[in-house]
C-alpha cells in the first residue's frame, strides 16, 4: 500500500511493504502561486540476502532546485504566468522552500518505507511525489 499525506507543511509518502520495484529516485515537488521547489531521495529495496550486493548503494543527497520560473520543460510555460499584482499588494507570496529533506532509505523487501519533506512558503502549497517522472497515486 502507498499512502500520501500532507499535513500543513509536512509532506510524506509511506510504502507499507516495499517491493524491489519500489526502489528508485523519489521526488517531492512543492508548488504555490509564487513558484515551486523540489527535492529528491533514493530508495533502495534489497530482495537478495546480503553478500550478493557487495558494493554499497549509491547514496546522493540532492539539494533543492528552488525555481522561479520552474525548470520543468513543458509545464513551465503554464506556471510562469503570474496574475497581475494588485495596486497595494498585502504581502508578496513566498515561493515554497524545502526546509527538511527526505532522507535516502535502504530497506529489505517487505519492510515499510516512509519519506518526509517539510516545506515553508505562502499557503496553499500542494506537494506531489514523483517517481520516474510519473505522479505517485495512493493505492
Curated annotation (Swiss-Prot):
Annotated segments matching region Disordered: 48-97
Record's catalysed reaction(s): L-seryl-[myosin light chain] + ATP = O-phospho-L-seryl-[myosin light chain] + ADP + H(+); L-threonyl-[myosin light chain] + ATP = O-phospho-L-threonyl-[myosin light chain] + ADP + H(+)
InterPro entries in the cross-refs: Ig-like_dom_sf (IPR036179), Ig-like_fold (IPR013783), Ig_I-set (IPR013098)
GO molecular function: actin binding; ATP binding; calmodulin binding; myosin light chain kinase activity
Binding partners and assembly: Interacts with SVIL.
Role: Phosphorylates a specific serine in the N-terminus of a myosin light chain. Also regulates actin-myosin interaction through a non-kinase activity.
Protein name: Myosin light chain kinase, smooth muscle
Lineage: Eukaryota, Metazoa, Chordata, Craniata, Vertebrata
Gene that this sequence comes from: MYLK
